[in-house]
Amino acid sequence: MDDIADRMRMDAGEVTLVNHNSVFKTHLLPQTGFPEDQLSLSDQQILSSRQGHLDRSFTCSTRSAAYNPSYYSDNPSSDSFLGSGDLRTFGQSANGQWRNSTPSSSSSLQKSRNSRSLYLETRKTSSGLSNSFAGKSNHHCHVSAYEKSFPIKPVPSPSWSGSCRRSLLSPKKTQRRHVSTAEETVQEEEREIYRQLLQMVTGKQFTIAKPTTHFPLHLSRCLSSSKNTLKDSLFKNGNSCASQIIGSDTSSSGSASILTNQEQLSHSVYSLSSYTPDVAFGSKDSGTLHHPHHHHSVPHQPDNLAASNTQSEGSDSVILLKVKDSQTPTPSSTFFQAELWIKELTSVYDSRARERLRQIEEQKALALQLQNQRLQEREHSVHDSVELHLRVPLEKEIPVTVVQETQKKGHKLTDSEDEFPEITEEMEKEIKNVFRNGNQDEVLSEAFRLTITRKDIQTLNHLNWLNDEIINFYMNMLMERSKEKGLPSVHAFNTFFFTKLKTAGYQAVKRWTKKVDVFSVDILLVPIHLGVHWCLAVVDFRKKNITYYDSMGGINNEACRILLQYLKQESIDKKRKEFDTNGWQLFSKKSQEIPQQMNGSDCGMFACKYADCITKDRPINFTQQHMPYFRKRMVWEILHRKLL
């Protein structure tokens, strides 16, 4: 033992540690013991160097790694350094020998905590140095003489689990897991997304800064697994470190109390992690820190403590604002934040919808006002046009168009009696006799190689539609009348001519004019059947125009073009020369220019009477009210094969 003591004897101000080929020297303080001011200074240096990065620290009382190579591999019991005041530290005597010093419980506790923190700091910053203190090297394992003299003795810990304490305090078995930047980024993104979700639902601002990763992950698992033991040590042991934190124990070293508060707060966070509804987080600028109230051995504390004691300026750590007792009822208003948010959104939507409806009503009112103004302005100008379209009453209607044409020599305008000759009683009896029931196939008139039966005559009775036989017979009578002196020569095509020309082309109808020269007459009459409607097209070689007449006001320029093309082909086929279309015009009479039918059955009568007036070079001066008269008159004319 004397040899061992001689080898371990050192100089007064120096300790030499041998590790492999390297020699590390630590210069000790010249005076004996550890003064509190120097310990506080070292603690302040440690705190200032690590405060910006260390988010969660932990509380543990151990010897300084720089002065005590013989550390505990397992956790010492809480009675050894928490409950009792028999905490021992190594000092240096005047002759260089190590000795124990037993200060007061408060200072000893702070020193032991600072020594433990110093040990952890030394481990984190100087891996090679801590390996030397632990008897390890980077390549080989050497056991120093001091370790042989003072072997490490494990101390059982009743408060903490052995596996967790060994993983925390044993540098030989603990391998710090490095957290990659990708993991930090993912965690930060998840926290930011959750913060935005909370802010959207509750309508409050949540400032949750980026957590630091300097705190080991295995420490959080160990602390969370032993939360029940920590709760007992925090709230039941009056002589423990928890009483110093919650009771805001004042000591001569302010930095030591700050570090202790941070350690205990981190313990409180992990031990109360299951009480998430009772923990309220806020921004670090709130300036207050709330502690729970317990009635075991902790005196009543105020709700607000200065945040400057726990967080340095510019720290990005999460700040625990208030920890509420689980027995305290939580205000129910926070659970209805989503409902209030929905109501607010609904109210905003309702206000927008009401504003939109108001604008729509204003636009409708403005449109109605403008429409009324336009109607009032056009009331006088369109009065005559509206009356013409409606034709009410028909008795007061006058001829729409009065065509002033140069009459040929020997022809004069006749009186109204000549235009509309009166039907005598004898003529009336004959017409009624035709309409009586009889043999429908009885031939009543025959001429122009056409035969008119009683069935055909019945189409002129009342509002029946005219058939092809009646129209073709009447057109032939117009051609026969045109042979009279002073009237324009007329040729009328069959009612099937235009339909055949349109569907089959010129080759299908070129033989229809084998015995007729269409270019030698003045007027060509072309009845046009549109399925259920009769119209008339007139080719006037004198005026060089093709005009379309429709009693319903229809426009059909296509029919006019088809007839003009027919004239070109007919001229080439019959006369062997081109038809000169220079000066020819195509017209479709508008509804304001010719009389319009006021029912759905007189279209055939209107087409025939258009042709009658045109072939006499007379104005079209009849109206809808004349249609019953024209029907009776046409019956008599067909029966006698002569126009009145």
UniProtKB/Swiss-Prot annotation:
GO terms for molecular function: deSUMOylase activity; endopeptidase activity; SUMO-specific endopeptidase activity. The active site is at H533, D550, C603 (nucleophile). It is found in: Nucleus; Cytoplasm. The keyword Cytoplasm applies. A motif (Nuclear export signal) lies at residues 635-644. Coiled coil: none annotated. It comes from the Eukaryota. Highly expressed in testis. Expressed at lower levels in thymus, pancreas, spleen, liver, ovary and small intestine. Keywords: Cytoplasm, Hydrolase, Nucleus, Phosphoprotein, Protease, Thiol protease, Ubl conjugation pathway. Protease that catalyzes two essential functions in the SUMO pathway. The first is the hydrolysis of an alpha-linked peptide bond at the C-terminal end of the small ubiquitin-like modifier (SUMO) propeptides, SUMO1, SUMO2 and SUMO3 leading to the mature form of the proteins. The second is the deconjugation of SUMO1, SUMO2 and SUMO3 from targeted proteins, by cleaving an epsilon-linked peptide bond between the C-terminal glycine of the mature SUMO and the lysine epsilon-amino group of the target protein. Deconjugates SUMO1 from HIPK2. This is Sentrin-specific protease 1. It comes from Homo sapiens (Human). The gene is SENP1.
